[in-house]
Amino acid sequence: MQTSMVSAKVSIWLVCSVICSSLVRATQSVCSSQNTATTDGVRNQFQSNGWCSNNCAGHQFAIVQGFMCWCSDSEPSTQTSVGDCSGTCPGYGYEDCGNADKDLFGYIYLGQTPLSSVQSVETSTESSVYVSSSSITSSSSTSIVDTTTISPTLTSTSTTPLTTASTSTTPSTDITSALPTTTSTKLSTSIPTSTTSSTSTTTSTSSSTSTTVSVTSSTSTTTSTTSSTLISTSTSSSSSSTPTTTSSAPISTSTTSSTSTSTSTTSPTSSSAPTSSSNTTPTSTTFTTTSPSTAPSSTTVTYTSTTASPITSTITSVNLQTSLKYSVITVTSVHTMDTNISEITSRYLTMKKVITQIYSSTLGATPTSAVATTSASVGGRITNNNNSNTTNSNTPTNKSTEKKGYWDSPGKIAATFVVVGVVCLVIICILIYLIHHYRTRPARKAQDFENEYQSKFYQSKYPNEVTTTTLHTPSPSSNSTFSTPRLIYTDEKGQIMSESPSPRQSTYSLTAGSPPNDPSTLASPFHDPILPRRTSTFLHSPIQKQHEKMESNVTLGEDTVLVDQRLDPSKMLNTLANDDATNHSTISLSDNVDYSRRVLRLMNE
Protein backbone atom coordinates (compact mmCIF):
# COMPACT_ATOMS: atom_id res chain seq x y z
CA MET A 1 0.00 0.00 0.00
CA GLN A 2 2.78 2.34 0.93
CA THR A 3 4.69 1.39 -2.19
CA SER A 4 1.73 2.29 -4.40
CA MET A 5 1.37 5.60 -2.64
CA VAL A 6 5.05 6.36 -3.08
CA SER A 7 4.89 5.48 -6.77
CA ALA A 8 1.82 7.67 -7.20
CA LYS A 9 3.59 10.58 -5.54
CA VAL A 10 6.63 10.07 -7.74
CA SER A 11 4.44 10.03 -10.84
CA ILE A 12 2.69 13.21 -9.80
CA TRP A 13 6.04 14.85 -9.07
CA LEU A 14 7.42 13.87 -12.47
CA VAL A 15 4.31 15.20 -14.26
CA CYS A 16 4.55 18.47 -12.39
CA SER A 17 8.24 18.73 -13.15
CA VAL A 18 7.64 18.22 -16.87
CA ILE A 19 4.82 20.75 -16.91
CA CYS A 20 6.85 23.31 -14.98
CA SER A 21 9.89 22.80 -17.16
CA SER A 22 7.81 23.23 -20.31
CA LEU A 23 6.27 26.38 -18.91
CA VAL A 24 9.68 27.76 -17.99
CA ARG A 25 11.19 26.99 -21.36
CA ALA A 26 8.30 28.60 -23.19
CA THR A 27 8.67 31.95 -21.41
CA GLN A 28 10.51 34.98 -22.73
CA SER A 29 13.81 35.42 -20.93
CA VAL A 30 15.28 38.40 -22.79
CA CYS A 31 13.71 41.41 -24.48
CA SER A 32 15.79 43.41 -26.93
CA SER A 33 15.53 45.71 -29.92
CA GLN A 34 18.18 43.63 -31.73
CA ASN A 35 17.41 40.60 -33.84
CA THR A 36 20.34 38.16 -33.85
CA ALA A 37 18.48 35.52 -35.86
CA THR A 38 20.56 33.06 -37.87
CA THR A 39 17.58 31.71 -39.84
CA ASP A 40 14.84 33.24 -41.94
CA GLY A 41 11.67 34.27 -40.16
CA VAL A 42 8.59 32.01 -40.28
CA ARG A 43 5.10 33.50 -40.20
CA ASN A 44 2.41 31.56 -38.35
CA GLN A 45 -1.18 32.66 -37.93
CA PHE A 46 -1.39 30.82 -34.61
CA GLN A 47 1.95 31.97 -33.25
CA SER A 48 2.84 31.06 -29.65
CA ASN A 49 5.93 30.60 -27.52
CA GLY A 50 5.55 26.83 -27.56
CA TRP A 51 5.20 26.60 -31.33
CA CYS A 52 8.24 28.82 -31.94
CA SER A 53 10.24 26.84 -29.37
CA ASN A 54 9.43 23.58 -31.14
CA ASN A 55 10.29 25.16 -34.48
CA CYS A 56 13.73 26.25 -33.18
CA ALA A 57 14.65 22.95 -31.56
CA GLY A 58 18.46 22.59 -31.56
CA HIS A 59 19.13 26.34 -31.29
CA GLN A 60 19.91 28.41 -28.22
CA PHE A 61 17.14 30.98 -28.60
CA ALA A 62 13.70 31.26 -30.20
CA ILE A 63 12.82 34.85 -31.16
CA VAL A 64 9.16 35.88 -31.36
CA GLN A 65 7.41 39.08 -32.45
CA GLY A 66 3.74 38.97 -33.35
CA PHE A 67 3.15 36.41 -36.10
CA MET A 68 6.93 35.93 -36.82
CA CYS A 69 9.34 33.40 -35.38
CA TRP A 70 13.17 33.31 -35.76
CA CYS A 71 15.93 31.06 -34.44
CA SER A 72 19.23 32.30 -32.99
CA ASP A 73 22.36 30.99 -31.27
CA SER A 74 23.61 34.23 -29.72
CA GLU A 75 22.33 36.54 -27.04
CA PRO A 76 21.73 40.22 -27.95
CA SER A 77 24.21 42.75 -26.59
CA THR A 78 21.58 45.34 -25.66
CA GLN A 79 18.62 44.28 -23.55
CA THR A 80 15.56 45.93 -22.05
CA SER A 81 13.09 44.90 -19.44
CA VAL A 82 11.21 41.70 -20.20
CA GLY A 83 7.99 43.51 -19.28
CA ASP A 84 8.37 45.71 -22.38
CA CYS A 85 7.77 42.66 -24.62
CA SER A 86 4.10 42.46 -23.64
CA GLY A 87 2.56 41.86 -27.03
CA THR A 88 -0.03 39.06 -26.98
CA CYS A 89 0.68 35.95 -29.03
CA PRO A 90 -1.90 35.47 -31.86
CA GLY A 91 -2.24 31.73 -31.20
CA TYR A 92 -2.33 31.78 -27.43
CA GLY A 93 -3.50 34.90 -25.64
CA TYR A 94 -1.93 33.97 -22.31
CA GLU A 95 1.60 34.31 -23.67
CA ASP A 96 3.66 37.34 -24.74
CA CYS A 97 5.32 37.44 -28.19
CA GLY A 98 7.56 40.50 -28.19
CA ASN A 99 6.13 43.93 -28.99
CA ALA A 100 5.59 44.84 -32.64
CA ASP A 101 4.52 48.40 -31.77
CA LYS A 102 7.84 49.18 -30.03
CA ASP A 103 9.86 46.99 -32.43
CA LEU A 104 11.02 44.70 -29.61
CA PHE A 105 11.87 41.01 -29.93
CA GLY A 106 11.24 38.40 -27.27
CA TYR A 107 13.99 35.80 -26.75
CA ILE A 108 13.04 32.36 -25.43
CA TYR A 109 16.11 30.52 -24.13
CA LEU A 110 16.12 26.85 -25.21
CA GLY A 111 19.48 25.73 -23.68
CA GLN A 112 20.05 23.61 -20.57
CA THR A 113 22.48 25.99 -18.80
CA PRO A 114 21.33 29.27 -17.26
CA LEU A 115 22.22 32.38 -19.20
CA SER A 116 24.35 33.85 -16.43
CA SER A 117 26.68 30.80 -16.34
CA VAL A 118 27.29 30.28 -20.05
CA GLN A 119 30.34 32.54 -20.31
CA SER A 120 31.82 31.31 -17.03
CA VAL A 121 31.55 27.70 -18.12
CA GLU A 122 33.49 28.42 -21.32
CA THR A 123 36.19 30.28 -19.41
CA SER A 124 36.52 27.44 -16.96
CA THR A 125 36.95 24.97 -19.79
CA GLU A 126 39.71 26.99 -21.42
CA SER A 127 41.54 27.31 -18.13
CA SER A 128 41.31 23.59 -17.54
CA VAL A 129 42.74 22.81 -20.95
CA TYR A 130 45.60 25.24 -20.41
CA VAL A 131 46.50 23.72 -17.06
CA SER A 132 46.36 20.23 -18.52
CA SER A 133 48.66 21.25 -21.38
CA SER A 134 51.13 22.75 -18.94
CA SER A 135 51.11 19.60 -16.88
CA ILE A 136 51.89 17.47 -19.90
CA THR A 137 54.74 19.73 -20.96
CA SER A 138 56.26 19.81 -17.52
CA SER A 139 56.08 16.08 -16.99
CA SER A 140 57.82 15.34 -20.28
CA SER A 141 61.32 16.22 -19.15
CA THR A 142 63.28 13.69 -21.16
CA SER A 143 62.99 15.30 -24.61
CA ILE A 144 61.13 18.14 -26.31
CA VAL A 145 62.89 17.83 -29.64
CA ASP A 146 61.57 16.05 -32.70
CA THR A 147 61.90 12.34 -33.35
CA THR A 148 65.40 12.72 -34.78
CA THR A 149 66.79 13.83 -31.39
CA ILE A 150 68.76 11.31 -29.34
CA SER A 151 69.06 12.18 -25.65
CA PRO A 152 71.29 10.54 -23.01
CA THR A 153 69.55 7.97 -20.83
CA LEU A 154 70.44 8.05 -17.15
CA THR A 155 69.68 5.27 -14.66
CA SER A 156 69.65 7.61 -11.70
CA THR A 157 66.77 9.55 -10.24
CA SER A 158 66.07 12.81 -12.04
CA THR A 159 64.39 15.75 -10.37
CA THR A 160 63.29 18.65 -12.57
CA PRO A 161 61.82 21.88 -11.20
CA LEU A 162 58.41 22.79 -12.64
CA THR A 163 58.56 26.11 -14.45
CA THR A 164 55.68 27.32 -16.60
CA ALA A 165 57.77 29.96 -18.39
CA SER A 166 60.09 27.45 -20.09
CA THR A 167 60.50 23.76 -20.85
CA SER A 168 63.13 21.46 -19.44
CA THR A 169 65.24 18.92 -21.27
CA THR A 170 68.57 17.22 -21.03
CA PRO A 171 71.40 18.28 -23.35
CA SER A 172 70.64 16.96 -26.78
CA THR A 173 72.23 16.85 -30.19
CA ASP A 174 70.19 17.21 -33.37
CA ILE A 175 71.14 14.99 -36.27
CA THR A 176 69.61 16.29 -39.47
CA SER A 177 70.16 14.69 -42.85
CA ALA A 178 69.52 16.77 -45.92
CA LEU A 179 69.72 16.19 -49.60
CA PRO A 180 72.08 18.26 -51.78
CA THR A 181 71.11 21.78 -52.71
CA THR A 182 69.32 22.25 -49.37
CA THR A 183 70.22 24.20 -46.26
CA SER A 184 68.62 23.44 -42.90
CA THR A 185 69.07 25.16 -39.54
CA LYS A 186 67.84 23.69 -36.24
CA LEU A 187 67.56 25.74 -33.03
CA SER A 188 67.24 23.97 -29.68
CA THR A 189 66.74 25.58 -26.29
CA SER A 190 66.64 24.03 -22.86
CA ILE A 191 66.52 24.94 -19.18
CA PRO A 192 68.77 23.62 -16.42
CA THR A 193 68.24 20.07 -15.24
CA SER A 194 69.23 19.04 -11.76
CA THR A 195 70.44 15.44 -11.52
CA THR A 196 71.83 13.58 -8.54
CA SER A 197 73.08 10.06 -9.00
CA SER A 198 75.92 7.70 -8.40
CA THR A 199 78.11 5.95 -10.91
CA SER A 200 76.19 3.48 -13.03
CA THR A 201 76.92 1.30 -16.02
CA THR A 202 74.60 1.15 -18.98
CA THR A 203 74.86 -1.24 -21.90
CA SER A 204 73.21 -0.11 -25.11
CA THR A 205 73.23 -1.28 -28.68
CA SER A 206 73.15 1.25 -31.52
CA SER A 207 73.43 1.06 -35.26
CA SER A 208 75.58 3.42 -37.27
CA THR A 209 76.75 3.70 -40.82
CA SER A 210 80.43 4.04 -41.58
CA THR A 211 82.00 5.09 -44.85
CA THR A 212 84.98 3.35 -46.37
CA VAL A 213 86.93 5.51 -48.80
CA SER A 214 89.22 3.74 -51.25
CA VAL A 215 92.03 5.75 -52.80
CA THR A 216 93.26 4.70 -56.23
CA SER A 217 96.77 3.25 -56.28
CA SER A 218 97.26 3.54 -52.52
CA THR A 219 96.91 1.49 -49.37
CA SER A 220 93.76 2.20 -47.38
CA THR A 221 93.72 1.66 -43.63
CA THR A 222 90.51 2.33 -41.73
CA THR A 223 90.31 2.37 -37.97
CA SER A 224 87.22 3.38 -36.00
CA THR A 225 87.31 3.76 -32.23
CA THR A 226 84.11 4.66 -30.39
CA SER A 227 83.47 4.95 -26.68
CA SER A 228 80.82 6.46 -24.43
CA THR A 229 78.41 6.65 -27.33
CA LEU A 230 74.89 7.85 -26.92
CA ILE A 231 74.87 10.14 -29.95
CA SER A 232 76.91 9.32 -33.07
CA THR A 233 78.15 11.77 -35.66
CA SER A 234 80.09 10.62 -38.72
CA THR A 235 83.11 12.65 -39.82
CA SER A 236 85.16 11.83 -42.91
CA SER A 237 88.56 13.32 -43.67
CA SER A 238 91.40 12.51 -46.02
CA SER A 239 94.95 13.77 -45.55
CA SER A 240 98.55 12.81 -44.97
CA SER A 241 98.33 13.60 -41.26
CA THR A 242 96.25 12.01 -38.50
CA PRO A 243 93.27 14.11 -37.34
CA THR A 244 92.37 13.78 -33.66
CA THR A 245 88.98 14.42 -32.08
CA THR A 246 88.69 14.90 -28.33
CA SER A 247 85.38 14.83 -26.46
CA SER A 248 84.63 15.45 -22.81
CA ALA A 249 80.88 14.91 -22.43
CA PRO A 250 78.25 12.19 -22.79
CA ILE A 251 78.57 12.86 -26.52
CA SER A 252 80.98 10.94 -28.76
CA THR A 253 82.06 11.24 -32.37
CA SER A 254 82.94 8.37 -34.66
CA THR A 255 85.60 9.39 -37.18
CA THR A 256 86.54 7.31 -40.18
CA SER A 257 89.65 8.36 -42.09
CA SER A 258 91.14 6.77 -45.17
CA THR A 259 94.41 7.80 -46.76
CA SER A 260 97.59 6.15 -47.88
CA THR A 261 99.25 4.87 -44.68
CA SER A 262 97.09 7.16 -42.55
CA THR A 263 94.87 6.29 -39.59
CA SER A 264 92.35 8.52 -37.82
CA THR A 265 91.51 7.68 -34.21
CA THR A 266 88.78 9.20 -32.10
CA SER A 267 89.49 9.22 -28.41
CA PRO A 268 86.56 10.64 -26.47
CA THR A 269 87.31 11.18 -22.82
CA SER A 270 84.55 11.50 -20.25
CA SER A 271 85.15 13.25 -16.99
CA SER A 272 84.37 11.43 -13.78
CA ALA A 273 83.26 12.89 -10.49
CA PRO A 274 82.62 11.68 -6.92
CA THR A 275 79.52 9.62 -6.42
CA SER A 276 78.37 11.61 -3.46
CA SER A 277 75.30 13.69 -4.11
CA SER A 278 76.62 16.59 -2.06
CA ASN A 279 79.46 17.36 -4.45
CA THR A 280 78.92 19.10 -7.79
CA THR A 281 81.28 19.11 -10.76
CA PRO A 282 80.79 21.06 -14.04
CA THR A 283 81.03 19.30 -17.36
CA SER A 284 82.27 20.97 -20.54
CA THR A 285 82.42 19.74 -24.09
CA THR A 286 85.24 20.49 -26.52
CA PHE A 287 85.53 19.31 -30.10
CA THR A 288 88.84 19.76 -31.91
CA THR A 289 89.20 18.75 -35.52
CA THR A 290 92.51 18.93 -37.37
CA SER A 291 92.23 19.12 -41.14
CA PRO A 292 95.12 18.72 -43.60
CA SER A 293 96.17 21.42 -46.04
CA THR A 294 96.53 19.18 -49.05
CA ALA A 295 94.26 16.63 -50.65
CA PRO A 296 94.64 14.12 -53.48
CA SER A 297 93.73 15.33 -56.91
CA SER A 298 91.64 12.33 -57.90
CA THR A 299 89.74 10.02 -55.57
CA THR A 300 87.25 7.24 -56.20
CA VAL A 301 84.64 7.00 -53.44
CA THR A 302 82.95 3.70 -52.62
CA TYR A 303 80.25 3.42 -49.95
CA THR A 304 79.83 0.42 -47.70
CA SER A 305 77.15 0.15 -45.02
CA THR A 306 78.06 -1.77 -41.86
CA THR A 307 76.48 -2.33 -38.44
CA ALA A 308 78.48 -1.61 -35.32
CA SER A 309 78.74 -4.09 -32.47
CA PRO A 310 77.00 -3.47 -29.10
CA ILE A 311 78.57 -0.63 -27.16
CA THR A 312 79.08 -0.59 -23.42
CA SER A 313 79.27 2.88 -21.93
CA THR A 314 79.81 4.16 -18.44
CA ILE A 315 78.13 7.42 -17.51
CA THR A 316 78.94 9.44 -14.45
CA SER A 317 76.86 12.53 -13.75
CA VAL A 318 76.77 14.64 -10.65
CA ASN A 319 74.32 17.49 -10.10
CA LEU A 320 74.83 19.18 -13.48
CA GLN A 321 73.09 22.29 -14.73
CA THR A 322 73.94 22.85 -18.37
CA SER A 323 72.27 25.33 -20.67
CA LEU A 324 72.48 25.06 -24.47
CA LYS A 325 72.08 28.47 -26.07
CA TYR A 326 71.69 27.49 -29.68
CA SER A 327 72.71 24.84 -32.13
CA VAL A 328 73.10 25.57 -35.83
CA ILE A 329 73.39 23.03 -38.60
CA THR A 330 74.35 24.40 -41.99
CA VAL A 331 74.14 22.17 -45.04
CA THR A 332 75.84 23.37 -48.21
CA SER A 333 75.66 21.60 -51.55
CA VAL A 334 78.18 22.22 -54.33
CA HIS A 335 77.68 20.94 -57.88
CA THR A 336 80.77 20.66 -60.08
CA MET A 337 80.74 20.04 -63.82
CA ASP A 338 83.58 18.15 -65.48
CA THR A 339 84.38 19.85 -68.78
CA ASN A 340 85.99 16.72 -70.21
CA ILE A 341 82.82 14.63 -70.22
CA SER A 342 80.34 17.53 -70.10
CA GLU A 343 78.24 16.23 -67.24
CA ILE A 344 77.91 16.62 -63.49
CA THR A 345 80.18 14.00 -61.97
CA SER A 346 80.47 15.04 -58.32
CA ARG A 347 78.32 16.47 -55.58
CA TYR A 348 79.66 17.76 -52.29
CA LEU A 349 77.61 17.90 -49.12
CA THR A 350 79.07 19.93 -46.27
CA MET A 351 77.47 20.07 -42.83
CA LYS A 352 78.75 22.39 -40.14
CA LYS A 353 77.39 22.29 -36.63
CA VAL A 354 78.26 25.12 -34.27
CA ILE A 355 77.47 24.88 -30.55
CA THR A 356 78.29 27.93 -28.47
CA GLN A 357 77.84 29.17 -24.89
CA ILE A 358 77.97 25.88 -23.03
CA TYR A 359 78.56 26.60 -19.34
CA SER A 360 77.86 25.22 -15.90
CA SER A 361 75.76 27.54 -13.79
CA THR A 362 76.55 25.74 -10.51
CA LEU A 363 80.16 26.84 -10.13
CA GLY A 364 79.92 29.93 -12.32
CA ALA A 365 82.43 28.63 -14.84
CA THR A 366 83.57 30.74 -17.74
CA PRO A 367 81.45 30.16 -20.85
CA THR A 368 83.17 27.93 -23.34
CA SER A 369 82.44 27.24 -26.97
CA ALA A 370 82.54 24.03 -28.91
CA VAL A 371 82.62 23.69 -32.66
CA ALA A 372 81.96 20.39 -34.33
CA THR A 373 82.41 20.25 -38.07
CA THR A 374 81.08 17.33 -40.01
CA SER A 375 81.79 16.98 -43.70
CA ALA A 376 80.66 14.38 -46.16
CA SER A 377 81.08 14.08 -49.89
CA VAL A 378 78.41 12.50 -51.99
CA GLY A 379 78.93 11.59 -55.61
CA GLY A 380 81.34 9.90 -57.96
CA ARG A 381 84.71 11.27 -59.03
CA ILE A 382 86.16 14.02 -56.87
CA THR A 383 88.63 16.54 -58.24
CA ASN A 384 90.51 18.54 -55.61
CA ASN A 385 92.62 21.68 -55.84
CA ASN A 386 96.07 20.84 -54.49
CA ASN A 387 96.90 24.49 -53.70
CA SER A 388 93.82 25.17 -51.57
CA ASN A 389 94.46 25.72 -47.84
CA THR A 390 90.94 25.35 -46.54
CA THR A 391 89.89 24.21 -43.09
CA ASN A 392 87.74 21.36 -44.39
CA SER A 393 89.71 19.12 -46.72
CA ASN A 394 86.63 17.22 -47.85
CA THR A 395 85.17 20.27 -49.55
CA PRO A 396 87.32 20.72 -52.68
CA THR A 397 87.06 23.85 -54.72
CA ASN A 398 86.77 23.18 -58.43
CA LYS A 399 87.21 25.86 -61.03
CA SER A 400 85.34 25.09 -64.19
CA THR A 401 86.69 26.92 -67.20
CA GLU A 402 84.11 28.18 -69.60
CA LYS A 403 84.85 29.34 -73.11
CA LYS A 404 84.13 32.98 -73.62
CA GLY A 405 81.68 33.78 -76.36
CA TYR A 406 81.80 36.51 -78.97
CA TRP A 407 79.93 39.04 -76.84
CA ASP A 408 82.33 38.50 -73.91
CA SER A 409 85.31 39.91 -75.88
CA PRO A 410 85.27 43.73 -76.20
CA GLY A 411 88.08 43.63 -78.77
CA LYS A 412 86.11 41.48 -81.18
CA ILE A 413 83.04 43.66 -80.85
CA ALA A 414 85.03 46.88 -81.40
CA ALA A 415 86.84 45.49 -84.45
CA THR A 416 83.57 44.36 -86.01
CA PHE A 417 81.90 47.73 -85.53
CA VAL A 418 84.95 49.60 -86.91
CA VAL A 419 84.98 47.52 -90.08
CA VAL A 420 81.24 47.91 -90.56
CA GLY A 421 81.50 51.67 -89.99
CA VAL A 422 84.30 52.08 -92.56
CA VAL A 423 82.38 50.10 -95.16
CA CYS A 424 79.24 52.16 -94.56
CA LEU A 425 81.24 55.41 -94.85
CA VAL A 426 82.76 54.33 -98.17
CA ILE A 427 79.35 53.39 -99.53
CA ILE A 428 77.90 56.76 -98.47
CA CYS A 429 80.77 58.65 -100.14
CA ILE A 430 80.31 56.72 -103.38
CA LEU A 431 76.59 57.47 -103.40
CA ILE A 432 77.22 61.19 -102.82
CA TYR A 433 79.75 61.30 -105.67
CA LEU A 434 77.42 59.50 -108.08
CA ILE A 435 74.51 61.80 -107.23
CA HIS A 436 76.64 64.92 -107.66
CA HIS A 437 78.12 63.64 -110.91
CA TYR A 438 74.70 62.84 -112.32
CA ARG A 439 73.23 66.20 -111.37
CA THR A 440 76.14 68.22 -112.85
CA ARG A 441 76.34 66.22 -116.06
CA PRO A 442 74.19 68.58 -118.20
CA ALA A 443 76.18 71.63 -117.07
CA ARG A 444 79.46 69.92 -117.83
CA LYS A 445 78.28 68.89 -121.27
CA ALA A 446 77.23 72.46 -122.03
CA GLN A 447 80.58 73.77 -120.78
CA ASP A 448 82.50 71.30 -122.93
CA PHE A 449 80.48 72.31 -125.94
CA GLU A 450 81.15 76.01 -125.31
CA ASN A 451 84.86 75.42 -124.83
CA GLU A 452 85.08 73.52 -128.07
CA TYR A 453 83.14 76.20 -129.91
CA GLN A 454 85.28 79.06 -128.63
CA SER A 455 88.47 77.22 -129.41
CA LYS A 456 87.48 76.45 -132.98
CA PHE A 457 86.07 79.90 -133.49
CA TYR A 458 89.23 81.80 -132.60
CA GLN A 459 91.51 79.28 -134.23
CA SER A 460 89.67 79.83 -137.50
CA LYS A 461 89.62 83.60 -137.00
CA TYR A 462 93.29 84.02 -136.09
CA PRO A 463 95.12 81.02 -137.47
CA ASN A 464 98.56 82.74 -137.54
CA GLU A 465 98.52 84.00 -133.96
CA VAL A 466 99.44 82.29 -130.78
CA THR A 467 96.42 80.96 -128.97
CA THR A 468 96.63 79.84 -125.39
CA THR A 469 93.84 77.68 -124.11
CA THR A 470 93.37 76.96 -120.43
CA LEU A 471 90.78 74.38 -119.54
CA HIS A 472 90.48 75.47 -115.94
CA THR A 473 89.74 78.72 -114.22
CA PRO A 474 92.73 80.09 -112.29
CA SER A 475 92.20 81.26 -108.76
CA PRO A 476 91.96 85.02 -108.23
CA SER A 477 95.14 85.00 -106.12
CA SER A 478 97.33 83.46 -108.83
CA ASN A 479 99.81 85.56 -110.80
CA SER A 480 97.84 85.53 -114.00
CA THR A 481 97.76 88.25 -116.65
CA PHE A 482 94.40 87.12 -117.94
CA SER A 483 91.61 89.68 -117.87
CA THR A 484 88.13 89.15 -119.11
CA PRO A 485 85.98 92.06 -120.30
CA ARG A 486 82.42 91.85 -119.29
CA LEU A 487 81.09 93.06 -122.66
CA ILE A 488 82.70 93.13 -126.10
CA TYR A 489 81.20 95.80 -128.33
CA THR A 490 81.41 95.51 -132.08
CA ASP A 491 80.05 97.56 -134.88
CA GLU A 492 79.15 96.80 -138.44
CA LYS A 493 82.73 97.31 -139.52
CA GLY A 494 84.02 94.50 -137.33
CA GLN A 495 85.71 96.80 -134.79
CA ILE A 496 86.07 95.24 -131.36
CA MET A 497 86.15 97.42 -128.26
CA SER A 498 86.48 96.06 -124.75
CA GLU A 499 84.60 97.27 -121.70
CA SER A 500 85.76 97.14 -118.10
CA PRO A 501 87.32 93.82 -117.16
CA SER A 502 85.27 91.24 -115.38
CA PRO A 503 86.40 89.88 -112.01
CA ARG A 504 86.06 86.42 -113.44
CA GLN A 505 89.15 85.27 -115.24
CA SER A 506 88.97 83.73 -118.62
CA THR A 507 89.76 80.23 -119.57
CA TYR A 508 90.78 81.45 -123.00
CA SER A 509 93.50 83.96 -123.90
CA LEU A 510 93.67 85.36 -127.39
CA THR A 511 96.25 87.78 -128.77
CA ALA A 512 95.38 89.07 -132.21
CA GLY A 513 97.68 91.18 -134.36
CA SER A 514 96.03 90.76 -137.69
CA PRO A 515 93.25 92.99 -138.84
CA PRO A 516 89.96 91.91 -137.46
CA ASN A 517 88.30 92.28 -140.81
CA ASP A 518 90.36 89.58 -142.43
CA PRO A 519 87.96 87.52 -144.55
CA SER A 520 89.76 84.34 -143.61
CA THR A 521 89.49 85.01 -139.89
CA LEU A 522 85.94 86.26 -139.93
CA ALA A 523 84.64 83.00 -141.18
CA SER A 524 82.52 80.76 -139.00
CA PRO A 525 84.35 78.14 -136.96
CA PHE A 526 82.43 75.60 -138.94
CA HIS A 527 83.47 77.34 -142.18
CA ASP A 528 80.10 78.58 -143.20
CA PRO A 529 80.44 79.69 -146.89
CA ILE A 530 77.85 82.41 -146.37
CA LEU A 531 79.98 84.42 -143.96
CA PRO A 532 82.57 85.61 -146.56
CA ARG A 533 79.83 87.19 -148.60
CA ARG A 534 78.38 88.86 -145.55
CA THR A 535 81.73 90.34 -144.68
CA SER A 536 82.28 91.95 -148.08
CA THR A 537 81.26 95.30 -146.64
CA PHE A 538 84.17 95.13 -144.22
CA LEU A 539 86.68 94.72 -147.03
CA HIS A 540 85.68 97.91 -148.85
CA SER A 541 85.32 100.03 -145.78
CA PRO A 542 87.02 103.44 -146.16
CA ILE A 543 88.52 103.15 -142.70
CA GLN A 544 90.06 99.76 -143.32
CA LYS A 545 93.56 101.13 -143.06
CA GLN A 546 92.78 102.74 -139.76
CA HIS A 547 91.69 99.41 -138.36
CA GLU A 548 94.76 97.73 -139.70
CA LYS A 549 96.89 100.04 -137.62
CA MET A 550 95.07 99.06 -134.43
CA GLU A 551 96.38 96.27 -132.33
CA SER A 552 93.82 94.38 -130.40
CA ASN A 553 94.60 92.55 -127.22
CA VAL A 554 91.25 91.16 -126.18
CA THR A 555 90.71 88.37 -123.67
CA LEU A 556 87.54 86.38 -124.12
CA GLY A 557 86.00 84.51 -121.22
CA GLU A 558 83.27 82.01 -120.69
CA ASP A 559 80.68 84.70 -120.02
CA THR A 560 81.89 87.07 -122.77
CA VAL A 561 79.02 88.55 -124.72
CA LEU A 562 79.58 90.07 -128.16
CA VAL A 563 77.16 92.94 -128.46
CA ASP A 564 76.69 95.63 -131.07
CA GLN A 565 77.31 98.96 -129.43
CA ARG A 566 74.23 100.44 -130.95
CA LEU A 567 72.15 98.04 -128.88
CA ASP A 568 73.64 99.30 -125.61
CA PRO A 569 71.92 102.44 -124.24
CA SER A 570 75.18 103.61 -122.67
CA LYS A 571 76.89 103.56 -126.10
CA MET A 572 74.08 105.14 -127.99
CA LEU A 573 75.72 108.60 -128.25
CA ASN A 574 79.29 107.41 -128.75
CA THR A 575 79.06 107.68 -132.53
CA LEU A 576 78.10 111.33 -132.30
CA ALA A 577 81.07 112.16 -130.10
CA ASN A 578 83.65 110.59 -132.40
CA ASP A 579 85.30 112.70 -135.09
CA ASP A 580 84.74 110.16 -137.74
CA ALA A 581 81.20 109.39 -136.67
CA THR A 582 79.89 110.41 -140.04
CA ASN A 583 82.03 107.79 -141.68
CA HIS A 584 80.43 105.01 -139.61
CA SER A 585 77.37 103.35 -140.86
CA THR A 586 74.53 103.23 -138.36
CA ILE A 587 72.20 101.18 -140.45
CA SER A 588 73.43 97.59 -140.51
CA LEU A 589 74.57 95.34 -137.68
CA SER A 590 77.75 93.33 -137.54
CA ASP A 591 76.85 90.52 -139.83
CA ASN A 592 80.19 88.85 -139.36
CA VAL A 593 79.27 87.81 -135.80
CA ASP A 594 77.42 84.53 -135.52
CA TYR A 595 74.80 85.00 -132.82
CA SER A 596 73.15 81.62 -133.37
CA ARG A 597 75.52 79.81 -131.00
CA ARG A 598 74.73 82.23 -128.22
CA VAL A 599 71.04 81.80 -128.72
CA LEU A 600 71.36 78.03 -128.73
CA ARG A 601 73.38 78.12 -125.54
CA LEU A 602 70.78 80.20 -123.75
CA MET A 603 68.05 77.89 -124.91
CA ASN A 604 69.94 74.81 -123.73
CA GLU A 605 70.50 76.27 -120.30
From Swiss-Prot:
GO terms for molecular function: protein transmembrane transporter activity. GO terms for biological process: cell wall organization; protein targeting to ER; protein targeting to membrane; response to heat. Keywords: Cell wall biogenesis/degradation, Glycoprotein, Membrane, Signal, Transmembrane, Transmembrane helix. Glycans are attached at N340, N386, N389, N398, N479, N553, N583. Residues 27-110 form the WSC domain. Residues 1-26 form the signal peptide. Residues 497-521 have a biased composition (Polar residues). Residues 381-399 have a biased composition (Low complexity). It comes from the Eukaryota. The keyword Membrane applies. It is a single-pass membrane protein. SMART domains: WSC. Residues 151-305, 381-404, 494-521 are annotated as: Disordered. GO terms for cellular component: endoplasmic reticulum membrane. The chain crosses the membrane at residues 415-435. The keyword Glycoprotein applies. It is found in: Membrane. This is Cell wall integrity and stress response component 4. It comes from Saccharomyces cerevisiae (strain ATCC 204508 / S288c) (Baker's yeast). The lineage of its organism: Eukaryota, Fungi, Dikarya, Ascomycota, Saccharomycotina.
